Amino acid sequence: MKKIIIIGATSGIGRGLAEVYSQEDYLIGITGRRENLLEEVCARDKDKLFYQVCDITDTQATISSLETLTQKMGGMDILIICAGTGELNPELSYQSEEPTLLTNVIGFTNIADWGFRYFEQQKSGHLVTISSVGGTRGSGIAPAYNASKAYQINYMEGLRQKATKSPYSIYTTDIRPGFVDTAMAKGEGLFWVTPVDKAVKQIKKAISKKKKVAFISKRWRYVTILFRLLPSAIYCRM
């Protein structure tokens, strides 16, 4: 029975993945800050679901929690980093930006490094992260969020290079959603908003295929290509 740990599983994509995987032959460990919601998810099947309360901005406590959770489950084969945050911040208030940086950059890096080292010692494993198509270009209304997702995309490419050169069976998957119908989707006039259940289904499929990069939904790949091709002079006027 494969063992999966999902970071940030109290709501949205993380919770959806935990619920879907619990219907199959997996042991699932979940983390989050809100214990009542973790208990709610685990109530679905207490024999297959385990939880550990964890705030990923506390880097030392996070590693301790992950080690405890891994011991409870008897190992880990797949690590999925879903935890993330971001705010619209056209006023450039640092108080709004700091939680994004602590979660999406510091917390993410701490967990990704721990997971990769764990898989190196185990000589196998699969590291998955939920980044965003927002990491493709900068954003005047959410500068820290887009920059943090660009960091995650670049960091995962570095780990993918490291995994490719490794003698071990280590895989990495960078999931890049567009707009998904969760609390993270902010702003007016959002388009191509993907329902959570559809996003979860596509993410699960990408993980099973060990895809290096997957766009959710698939059409966002073409939007990303267009954004990359746009000259800065045009993009900055959008």
Where are the model-predicted features located?
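C-terminal helical subdomain
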Residues: 174, 186-224
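Residue(s) in the substrate-gating loop at a strand-loop-helix junction
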Residues: 132
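Short alpha-helical oligomerization interface
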Residues: 89-102
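Active-site helix of classical SDR
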Residues: 112, 148
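Conserved glycine-rich Rossmann-like NAD(P)H-binding loop of the short-chain dehydrogenase/reductase
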Residues: 24-40
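Conserved glycine-rich cofactor-binding loop
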Residues: 10-11
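Conserved NAD(P)H cofactor-binding loop of Rossmann-fold oxidoreductase domains
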Residues: 82-88
